[in-house]
Amino acid sequence: MKRRFSIPWDDLSPLLDGMSAIDSPRLEIRSLEDADDFLESYGYDWRITEDREELEKLRTESIDFIERDLLFDEPQLVIPREVRTEQDIRKLLLWSSDMTYPERQRWAWVIFRVIHIFSHSSSYFDEKYGDAIREQILGRFRPHVFSDGDAISLGTGPGSVSLSAFDIRGRKARTSAALKLLHKRDAGGSEIFDWVGVRLVTHDRYDALRVVRYLREHNVVNFMQVQPGRTRNTLIDIDRIEDELVELNELARAGKLPDYMVESELRKRVNQHNYPSPPEKSYNPNSSLAYHSIQFTCMQRIHVRDRDNMIVSAFFDRLPVRGNPMVKALRAYADRLEPNSDVRFLFPFELQILDQHSYELSRSGLASHHVYKERQRQRVKERLLGESIRRAAE
């Protein structure tokens, strides 16, 4: 049968209107040759054993994630055995395009989209230099954080701020990164800014403002390195604080308020304020309206000594067949490598500032991390499995 002229709009939408490929309903792969070319443009060569092994690892990881994290409360949904056991990724691509068998098409496409996300759910720099990254970021704060038994403070002396908690988060799990990316409209590894997270908890909201001021005045963070569009403040009303500070200073100038009481009066007022409304365009739609914090993303210039080249040279030195021509050629190549080359790069970290009340809310109720992750999971289920869930309910 002669095929009529058509345009593969589903494949072109990500290029023409910015729609995420995750939201495309299907692929347009017509043959194994097409699948080979598609994978090659993706960065994988099916003829290379290492590439096939990496794809198989991603496939297995993706199926485990779907079944463990998305389907545990959907017993009516089961990945068809034919799709679940197929190890040839090219066939999954073909099935993702073939509408002749709708159920197979839907599940093959679900699996490949999750494979795509897992291929983005890691950071090369975090995996290779994660310990050094955290140490250098923590190193910016360590000289300013003081602990005396149960008491913690940011700085010492008159400008210090009492803290109830200070911590730096450990490495983000790949499944957590995948879930985060799957709910984003723009799903890509470069969109994860919180591989490293720093949190400071103050006793009241006014001290949260003082923490921001301290970080700036002591260059603990550089405001030039704060990422535009990655700041979210739902903790303190800056405009209202500015107006009230002007009012209090005018009262002091008029002799109606002692100068030494200006800040204490401002503290009292700030702590009585209602929480500000969240921005209309929040970069995290899963954040609860009950969650209040100051958050921003800052870049840290990381400097590490890469010892891999030195290890390569030492390996060749220990080989018992150093006279072999091939080994000699490889050793000559290793000699041209800098044994202790320096690596420098920018790496993001997210800083959160909360008051004690907001911190306690974040550990229970609507603002808790567990509830936040569940909202995220439900959005991902709808995005990937919405049609299958609705069909199963019919």
Language-model-detected regions and their locations in the chain:
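Active-site-proximal betaalpha loop/short-helix elements
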Residues: 161-163
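Residue-level signal for the start and early helices of compact helical domains
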Residues: 157-159, 168-172, 187, 285-287, ...
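Acidic, Ser/Thr- and Gly/Pro-rich intrinsically disordered linkers and low-complexity segments
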Residues: 150-158
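General structural signal for secondary-structure boundaries
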Residues: 28-35, 169-177
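Extended, domain-scale alpha-helical bundle/helix-rich regions
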Residues: 92-151, 165-174, 180-207
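An acidic, glycine-/histidine-flanked metal-binding catalytic module
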Residues: 1-120, 127, 144, 206-394
